[in-house]
Protein backbone atom coordinates (compact mmCIF):
# COMPACT_ATOMS: atom_id res chain seq x y z
CA UNK A 1 0.00 0.00 0.00
CA UNK A 2 2.80 2.44 0.91
CA UNK A 3 4.66 1.64 -2.32
CA UNK A 4 1.50 2.27 -4.35
CA UNK A 5 0.88 5.60 -2.61
CA UNK A 6 4.49 6.76 -3.04
CA UNK A 7 4.54 5.80 -6.73
CA UNK A 8 1.07 7.19 -7.35
CA UNK A 9 -0.30 3.98 -8.81
CA UNK A 10 -2.70 1.22 -7.82
CA UNK A 11 -1.75 -1.74 -5.63
CA UNK A 12 -2.45 -4.03 -8.60
CA UNK A 13 0.08 -2.12 -10.72
CA UNK A 14 2.71 -2.43 -7.99
CA UNK A 15 2.07 -6.18 -7.86
CA UNK A 16 2.41 -6.57 -11.63
CA UNK A 17 5.62 -4.51 -11.83
CA UNK A 18 7.41 -6.19 -8.93
CA UNK A 19 6.36 -9.69 -10.00
CA UNK A 20 7.60 -9.10 -13.53
CA UNK A 21 4.15 -9.61 -15.05
CA UNK A 22 3.89 -6.07 -16.42
CA UNK A 23 5.48 -6.09 -19.86
CA UNK A 24 6.19 -2.36 -20.15
CA UNK A 25 9.37 -0.85 -18.75
CA UNK A 26 8.10 2.73 -18.69
CA UNK A 27 7.92 5.65 -16.26
CA UNK A 28 5.29 3.87 -14.17
CA UNK A 29 7.52 0.81 -13.74
CA UNK A 30 10.47 3.00 -12.82
CA UNK A 31 8.41 4.92 -10.25
CA UNK A 32 7.27 1.68 -8.65
CA UNK A 33 10.81 0.28 -8.43
CA UNK A 34 12.16 3.55 -7.05
CA UNK A 35 9.39 3.70 -4.45
CA UNK A 36 10.01 0.09 -3.43
CA UNK A 37 13.74 0.78 -3.08
CA UNK A 38 13.11 3.98 -1.12
CA UNK A 39 10.79 2.17 1.31
CA UNK A 40 13.04 -0.88 1.59
CA UNK A 41 10.39 -3.17 0.13
CA UNK A 42 11.42 -6.51 -1.36
CA UNK A 43 9.35 -9.18 -3.05
CA UNK A 44 8.57 -12.28 -1.00
CA UNK A 45 9.31 -14.88 -3.67
CA UNK A 46 8.27 -17.78 -1.49
CA UNK A 47 4.82 -16.29 -0.91
CA UNK A 48 4.51 -15.37 -4.58
CA UNK A 49 5.39 -18.92 -5.57
CA UNK A 50 2.66 -20.33 -3.36
CA UNK A 51 0.12 -18.06 -5.05
CA UNK A 52 1.26 -18.32 -8.66
CA UNK A 53 3.24 -21.59 -8.93
CA UNK A 54 6.10 -19.47 -10.33
CA UNK A 55 9.25 -19.01 -8.26
CA UNK A 56 11.14 -16.60 -10.57
CA UNK A 57 14.22 -18.82 -10.17
CA UNK A 58 16.41 -20.63 -12.69
CA UNK A 59 18.73 -23.46 -11.67
CA UNK A 60 22.20 -23.89 -13.16
CA UNK A 61 24.27 -27.05 -12.59
CA UNK A 62 27.94 -26.98 -13.64
CA UNK A 63 30.98 -29.21 -12.95
CA UNK A 64 33.15 -26.36 -11.63
CA UNK A 65 32.96 -22.59 -11.21
CA UNK A 66 36.67 -22.17 -11.98
CA UNK A 67 36.77 -23.70 -15.46
CA UNK A 68 36.97 -21.01 -18.17
CA UNK A 69 33.88 -22.31 -19.98
CA UNK A 70 31.78 -22.37 -16.80
CA UNK A 71 33.00 -18.94 -15.73
CA UNK A 72 32.13 -17.45 -19.11
CA UNK A 73 28.75 -19.16 -19.05
CA UNK A 74 28.00 -17.62 -15.65
CA UNK A 75 29.04 -14.20 -16.94
CA UNK A 76 26.58 -14.52 -19.81
CA UNK A 77 23.64 -16.13 -18.01
CA UNK A 78 23.49 -14.12 -14.80
CA UNK A 79 22.96 -10.65 -16.34
CA UNK A 80 20.28 -12.05 -18.65
CA UNK A 81 18.42 -13.69 -15.79
CA UNK A 82 18.76 -10.53 -13.70
CA UNK A 83 17.29 -8.46 -16.54
CA UNK A 84 14.26 -10.74 -16.54
CA UNK A 85 13.83 -10.23 -12.76
CA UNK A 86 14.79 -13.85 -12.12
CA UNK A 87 17.07 -15.35 -9.49
CA UNK A 88 19.90 -17.76 -10.36
CA UNK A 89 20.41 -20.78 -8.11
CA UNK A 90 23.78 -22.46 -8.67
CA UNK A 91 24.65 -26.10 -8.10
CA UNK A 92 28.23 -27.34 -8.52
CA UNK A 93 29.08 -31.01 -8.91
CA UNK A 94 32.17 -32.57 -10.46
CA UNK A 95 30.79 -36.12 -10.61
CA UNK A 96 27.66 -37.79 -11.94
CA UNK A 97 26.43 -38.50 -8.41
CA UNK A 98 27.04 -34.94 -7.22
CA UNK A 99 25.28 -33.44 -10.22
CA UNK A 100 22.29 -35.75 -9.81
CA UNK A 101 21.97 -34.54 -6.21
CA UNK A 102 22.17 -30.89 -7.28
CA UNK A 103 19.52 -31.42 -9.96
CA UNK A 104 17.21 -33.11 -7.46
CA UNK A 105 17.75 -30.33 -4.93
CA UNK A 106 16.98 -27.57 -7.44
CA UNK A 107 13.92 -29.41 -8.75
CA UNK A 108 12.64 -29.74 -5.19
CA UNK A 109 13.04 -25.97 -4.83
CA UNK A 110 10.58 -25.68 -7.73
CA UNK A 111 12.84 -23.68 -10.04
CA UNK A 112 11.05 -22.51 -13.18
CA UNK A 113 13.75 -23.93 -15.44
CA UNK A 114 17.03 -25.81 -15.27
CA UNK A 115 20.29 -25.47 -17.22
CA UNK A 116 22.75 -28.36 -16.93
CA UNK A 117 26.37 -28.65 -18.05
CA UNK A 118 27.24 -32.34 -17.53
CA UNK A 119 30.50 -33.29 -15.86
CA UNK A 120 32.98 -35.32 -17.91
CA UNK A 121 31.69 -38.87 -18.31
CA UNK A 122 28.43 -38.14 -16.46
CA UNK A 123 25.31 -39.94 -17.68
CA UNK A 124 22.43 -37.86 -16.33
CA UNK A 125 19.72 -39.32 -18.58
CA UNK A 126 17.83 -41.01 -15.75
CA UNK A 127 17.90 -37.95 -13.53
CA UNK A 128 16.95 -35.51 -16.28
CA UNK A 129 14.14 -37.71 -17.62
CA UNK A 130 12.73 -37.90 -14.10
CA UNK A 131 11.96 -34.18 -14.16
CA UNK A 132 11.68 -33.38 -17.88
CA UNK A 133 7.90 -33.81 -18.04
CA UNK A 134 7.24 -31.03 -15.53
CA UNK A 135 10.39 -28.87 -15.69
CA UNK A 136 11.92 -27.14 -18.75
CA UNK A 137 15.51 -28.40 -18.97
CA UNK A 138 18.32 -27.35 -21.30
CA UNK A 139 21.56 -29.33 -21.45
CA UNK A 140 24.68 -27.53 -22.65
CA UNK A 141 27.28 -29.74 -24.36
CA UNK A 142 27.64 -33.48 -23.96
CA UNK A 143 25.69 -36.28 -25.61
CA UNK A 144 21.92 -36.14 -25.81
CA UNK A 145 20.88 -39.11 -23.73
CA UNK A 146 17.59 -37.70 -22.40
CA UNK A 147 15.14 -37.40 -25.35
CA UNK A 148 12.82 -34.93 -23.59
CA UNK A 149 15.67 -32.50 -22.82
CA UNK A 150 16.77 -29.75 -25.22
CA UNK A 151 20.51 -29.76 -25.96
CA UNK A 152 22.76 -26.90 -27.04
CA UNK A 153 26.10 -28.26 -28.16
CA UNK A 154 28.72 -28.70 -30.82
CA UNK A 155 28.65 -31.16 -33.70
CA UNK A 156 32.07 -32.55 -32.79
CA UNK A 157 32.22 -34.83 -35.82
CA UNK A 158 31.74 -31.88 -38.18
CA UNK A 159 34.17 -29.76 -36.16
CA UNK A 160 36.89 -32.43 -36.28
CA UNK A 161 36.39 -32.90 -40.01
CA UNK A 162 36.73 -29.14 -40.55
CA UNK A 163 40.00 -29.13 -38.57
CA UNK A 164 41.55 -32.05 -40.45
CA UNK A 165 40.33 -30.73 -43.80
CA UNK A 166 41.93 -27.36 -43.06
CA UNK A 167 45.25 -29.03 -42.22
CA UNK A 168 45.13 -31.01 -45.45
CA UNK A 169 44.37 -27.89 -47.49
CA UNK A 170 47.39 -26.17 -45.94
CA UNK A 171 49.64 -28.97 -47.15
CA UNK A 172 50.14 -30.55 -43.73
CA UNK A 173 51.14 -34.21 -44.11
CA UNK A 174 50.84 -35.42 -40.51
CA UNK A 175 49.31 -34.40 -37.19
CA UNK A 176 49.31 -35.46 -33.54
CA UNK A 177 46.35 -35.56 -31.16
CA UNK A 178 46.52 -33.79 -27.79
CA UNK A 179 43.69 -33.76 -25.25
CA UNK A 180 42.90 -33.65 -21.55
CA UNK A 181 42.94 -36.70 -19.34
CA UNK A 182 39.16 -37.08 -19.25
CA UNK A 183 38.32 -40.76 -19.59
CA UNK A 184 34.81 -40.61 -20.98
CA UNK A 185 32.79 -42.00 -23.86
CA UNK A 186 32.77 -38.54 -25.45
CA UNK A 187 36.58 -38.29 -25.35
CA UNK A 188 37.01 -41.77 -26.83
CA UNK A 189 34.48 -41.02 -29.56
CA UNK A 190 36.23 -37.77 -30.49
CA UNK A 191 39.60 -39.54 -30.63
CA UNK A 192 38.13 -42.15 -32.96
CA UNK A 193 36.63 -39.39 -35.10
CA UNK A 194 40.08 -37.80 -35.40
CA UNK A 195 41.53 -41.03 -36.80
CA UNK A 196 38.61 -41.47 -39.20
CA UNK A 197 39.08 -38.06 -40.77
CA UNK A 198 42.87 -38.38 -40.81
CA UNK A 199 42.47 -41.49 -42.97
CA UNK A 200 39.83 -39.81 -45.14
CA UNK A 201 42.09 -36.86 -45.97
CA UNK A 202 45.27 -38.93 -46.22
CA UNK A 203 47.14 -37.46 -43.26
CA UNK A 204 49.57 -39.54 -41.21
CA UNK A 205 49.54 -39.92 -37.44
CA UNK A 206 51.09 -42.21 -34.85
CA UNK A 207 50.03 -43.58 -31.48
CA UNK A 208 53.42 -42.43 -30.15
CA UNK A 209 52.56 -38.82 -30.94
CA UNK A 210 49.30 -38.74 -29.01
CA UNK A 211 49.38 -36.91 -25.68
CA UNK A 212 46.75 -37.00 -22.93
CA UNK A 213 46.83 -35.06 -19.69
CA UNK A 214 46.67 -31.58 -18.21
Residue ranges and their predicted role:
Residues 1-55:
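N-terminal helix-turn-helix DNA-binding module of bacterial transcription factors
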Residues 8, 110-111, 171-174:
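Short loop/turn motifs at secondary-structure junctions
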Residues 11-16, 50-66, 166, 173-181:
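Short beta-strand segments enriched in small/hydrophobic residues
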Residues 35, 76-80, 127-131, 189-201:
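Alpha-helical structural signal in soluble globular domains
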Residues 56-165, 169:
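Alpha-helical recognition/docking segments in bacterial nutrient-uptake
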Amino acid sequence: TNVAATAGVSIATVSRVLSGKRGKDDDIARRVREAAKQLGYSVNYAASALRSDVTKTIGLVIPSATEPFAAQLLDEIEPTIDTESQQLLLGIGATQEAQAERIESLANRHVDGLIVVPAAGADLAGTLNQYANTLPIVQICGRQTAPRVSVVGIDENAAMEAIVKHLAEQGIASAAYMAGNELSFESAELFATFHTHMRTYGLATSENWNQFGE
